């Protein structure tokens, strides 16, 4: 994935192109054939979408902005219909304002129509509180590589042979002692600062939708657990977003986010953040038992 859609090319667009071409067995910079495929697949860049009635169940304009004030809030919801629609269509509030104008964007209500990127929507209504994704005979064997330098998460299928093509190092270096298999997915990610990165080999131990979260200011700042904590409920604007995949390294996981536009552009306290639309798709590729290599 290229990250959130803003109508402009950037580093994550390039990395998405390189990864897709690699998946197809082509040189990373094979733009001509990629553009032809894209134009055949997506006839129109934009579409018109209606704000669904169910959106009102996920909006709380009075949601506190400070983590320490979220205790007791039942749902960590979106703060506006604009935010709901931006995440639903993999973009930013600013880009929807650019496409539709401030008056329309800020005045959104259920039933209103909005110009959006032409992409399959992220359906928050399909996420269930506490739903666990269990081990899977195939998906639990997949390998994950977290490239902390380039801020990407790669998923490999060892049942498919590795495709060796010129320029693979432009995506991620292959220095493993054993073959990882074919690269089948790439997600942009936010990683921690160097002091919080735990290089090595781990495993996915659990994967749960709409997780609750414990705000521990001391742990986020130092990596050591404190006693002054706040229990935070689930929701799309929870700091861990719509999914938590815990690793065998205690306290560390791959999870969603409350701020998709910062993915790959900020730092975490040690975990690996995905946009909520990518986090929702993650269990289609990975289940508990999968190996995780942090580079």
Predicted regions and their residues:
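Gly/Pro-biased beta-strand-loop elements
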Residues: 128-255
């Amino acid at each position: 994935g290229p990250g959130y859609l803003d109508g402009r090319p950037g580093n994550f667009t390039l990395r998405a192109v390189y990864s897709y071409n690699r998946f197809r067995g082509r040189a990373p910079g094979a733009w001509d054939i990629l553009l032809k495929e894209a134009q055949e697949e997506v006839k129109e860049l934009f579409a018109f979408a209606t704000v669904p009635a169910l959106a009102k169940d996920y909006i709380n304009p009075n949601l506190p902005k400070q983590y320490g004030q979220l205790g007791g809030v039942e749902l960590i919801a979106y703060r506006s219909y604009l935010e709901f629609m931006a995440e639903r269509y993999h973009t930013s509030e600013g880009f929807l304002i650019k496409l539709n104008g401030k008056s329309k964007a800020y005045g959104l209500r259920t039933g209103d129509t909005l110009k959006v990127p032409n992409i399959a929507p992220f359906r928050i209504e399909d996420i269930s509180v506490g739903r666990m994704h269990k081990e899977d005979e195939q998906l639990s064997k997949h390998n994950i590589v977290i490239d902390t330098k380039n801020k990407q998460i790669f998923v490999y299928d060892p049942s498919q042979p590795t495709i060796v093509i010129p320029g693979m190092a432009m995506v991620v270096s292959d220095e493993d002692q054993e073959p990882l298999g074919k690269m089948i997915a790439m997600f942009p990610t936010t990683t921690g600062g160097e002091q919080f990165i735990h290089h090595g080999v781990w495993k996915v131990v659990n994967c749960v939708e709409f997780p609750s979260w414990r705000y521990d200011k001391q742990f986020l700042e130092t990596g050591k657990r404190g006693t002054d904590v706040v229990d935070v409920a689930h929701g799309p604007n929870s700091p861990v977003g719509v999914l938590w995949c815990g690793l065998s390294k205690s306290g560390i996981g791959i999870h969603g986010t409350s701020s998709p536009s910062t993915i790959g552009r900020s730092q975490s306290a040690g975990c690996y953040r995905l946009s909520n639309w990518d986090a929702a798709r993650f269990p289609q590729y990975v289940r508990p038992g999968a190996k995780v290599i942090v580079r």
